[in-house]
Structures are given as C-alpha cells and as structure tokens.
Regions:
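Short strand->helix junction
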Residues: 114-116, 307-308
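Ser/Thr-glycine-rich phosphate-binding loops at phosphate-binding pockets of nucleotides
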Residues: 109-115, 136-140
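Charged catalytic cores and adjacent phosphate/nucleic-acid-binding surfaces used
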Residues: 2-6, 81, 85-104, 122, ...
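Long, highly charged, low-complexity intrinsically disordered interaction regions
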Residues: 1-100
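Core AdoMet radical
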Residues: 138-139, 184-186
Length: 347
C-alpha cells in the first residue's frame, strides 16, 4: 500500500468512527477527538505520517492521542480498526419503523455546516447525505441575528453561494449528479418579519423559517408572528414549530403557545410545508399537532436539522412519526425530485 493510500484509509476510518459516535449521540468531545485526528494527518505529507507511524511518534502531533493513534496504525497496516468494527457491529437500525417513508425520501432540507453552528464542512455533509441515499440536500445555515449560532452575515452568505456553486461542479461529476441547494434557516423576528433581506432570499432555493427567540410570548401575538412569516412568498418550510426540547444536554423546554389551527391553515393556504423535525431532542411537532396538520391537508418536510454527518441518519425518527400520524409520501416535499421541488419553492 502506498503512503498516500494508507493515510487516506486512516483518515476515512477516523471520520467513520466520528460518524457512528454522532449517530449514537455520544458526547461531542469524543466525536471531535476523532475528527481532529483525521484533520491533523490529512494536512500532513503522507510520507511524514508514515515516518511517524514507523518511529512511534504520532502522538507528538497535536490532536493525536493513544486511541486515535491505534486507529491510524491499524488502518495504515491495511486492517479495519478494531474500534470501527465494534461501532459498525453495534450500529444496527435506529428504529424498525418508518422504513417506507425513509425509502421515499430524496433529500434533507434542513441541515447546518461549520459555516454556522454545524461541526463539519459542507462537502462532508453532502457526501454523507449521498451515501445515505439522497439525491440532493438543502444547506440551511443560520441567518445573521442568531449570533450564538454564528449566523451568516450578508457578505458570508454571498460567499457561501459561490462556494456551493464550485462544490456542485465537483459533486455532480463525482456523485451521479448530487446537488447542494442553497438555503437558509431564517429567524422569524418578533414582529413576523424575516432576519434576511429580500434580495438574498430571492437567490435561495429553500427557505426554512423558524422561531428562535421570545419563545414564551403569549399565544395571540405568537400566532400573528408565525402567520406573517408563513405568508411571506419566500418561505417554504416552517421549522420546528413549537420550539420544544424534550431531552438532551440543553435540558427541556415547553412548547410555544399559538393557535395551531390558524397556523396550519396559513401553511395550507400559502403553500408552506410543516417541518417534521427529526432531532431526538425536538421531535417537533408533537403527534397531536402533527395529526392536526394532516387533517388540515398540509404538506410536510421531514428533516434532520443535522449539525454533523452522523446526525443525517436521524431522519428515520421523523419518518416513524410521519407514518404513525398518517402522513403519506406524496405529501412530503422531500420525496419529490429536485426539479419538482424547485418549481414548488419558486416564489
């Protein structure tokens, strides 16, 4: 095996371990340790990595510890690292339900990269989505007001559009036409306006609008706030509508109060999809509201809201809830092919 091939095997093994740890909701610091090790050796000449492997000095590099060193050594020797084998064998299905819906999905329309508060490059998110069977995805990094999530300024958003355009040339050639759609998760301001100027919104393919602030405001103004956003012709998806948190490191958070019938009627009338958010700590909307949206003839988008590659596999949780509540594949916009979706999202 050449030095280059050995290093590529090691980088791939380290990233795969990170993927399985993310998928299993392991602590972030554990995931980052393997990703950091992958980045460290990927940035070095292959000959140097090989020399350090032979001399036993890999751990002298920043970001390489005994556990990650063991993975690198096994991979460079041509073996599948024992820890990766263990994780692969333990992975299994996240849930046995939702398979029919998951098989119908062609995309994920809500995910984040390292440009905002995600943990991985755009390309890595895209390649993982392709490996999971998707044909396209929407990159929806945060809008500028959400500074805690490193929301993109106008200048950074324009820069990202250029980066995605170049990356798509590469991915479409290498991954059977796989495409990254330009998107945003835009904050719904307190008055229902959007945290992004119209010129930028008009250049995006998919706009997910979400409430991230003043979550405990009274039901009447919250309803008005959400309806105003839904009525905006640029908005395609209403993200995690109740804002609830039911588990996880951030603790729990109650649902925002709003008139669900009014909000879902606005979604139906203005052609805005109700997101079925698949994150385990959200699972939003609750089943009683999801069933109501089904009764009111809404359309849906089943998304992961992934912030890392391993989280892209969580989509099946949303699929399970969709099937439980009577959502059929034809009413889920990310079961549609890319052209049909883009025709639907066009203002």
């Amino acid at each position: 095996m050449t030095d280059k091939a050995g290093v590529e095997r090691a980088v791939g093994a380290l990233r795969a371990i990170g993927y399985y740890l993310e998928r299993d909701r392991q602590p972030t610091h554990r995931v980052k340790a393997y990703r950091r090790a992958a980045d460290t050796i990927a940035a070095l000449p292959a000959s140097e990595v090989r020399a350090r492997r032979r001399a036993g000095t890999l751990t002298e590099l920043a970001g390489i510890g005994p556990k990650t060193e063991a993975v690198i050594v096994e991979a460079m020797d041509g073996a599948t690292p024992a820890y990766l084998v263990k994780l692969e064998e333990a992975a299994g299905e996240l849930t046995s339900a939702g398979k029919r819906m998951r098989a119908a999905l062609q995309a994920d329309l809500h995910l984040h990269s390292e440009w905002s508060d995600g943990g991985s490059p755009i390309e890595e998110m895209a390649r993982t989505a392709y490996r999971l069977g998707h044909k396209y995805l929407a990159l929806t990094d945060h809008s500028p007001r959400l500074t805690v999530a490193n929301g993109l300024s106008r200048e950074r958003r324009l820069q990202q559009l250029e980066v995605v355009a170049e990356l798509n040339k590469k991915l479409q050639a290498e991954l059977d036409g796989f495409t990254i759609l330009n998107g945003i998760e835009v904050d719904i301001n307190e008055d229902g306006t959007l945290d992004c100027d119209t010129e930028i919104l008009a250049r995006l393919d998919v706009v997910v609008a979400s409430v991230h602030s003043k979550l405990r405001m009274a039901a009447e103004p919250m309803t008005e706030r959400m309806v105003r956003a839904i009525a905006n012709p640029h908005v395609d998806v209403l993200g995690h509508c109740t804002g609830r948190l039911i588990t996880g490191a951030r603790g729990t958070r109650p649902e925002s109060e709003f008139d669900a019938e009014v909000v879902f009627e606005a979604c139906r009338q203005f052609g805005t999809a109700v997101e079925i958010n698949s994150r385990p700590e959200r699972l939003d909307p609750p089943k009683r509201l999801l069933s109501l949206a089904v009764e009111m003839d809404c359309v849906f988008s089943i998304d992961t809201d992934a912030h890392a590659p391993g989280q892209l596999d969580w989509q099946v949780y949303g699929c399970e809830r969709a099937e439980d509540c009577g959502v059929t594949p034809e009413r889920v916009i990310n079961t549609w092919d890319q052209q049909e979706l883009l025709e639907w999202t066009a203002p």
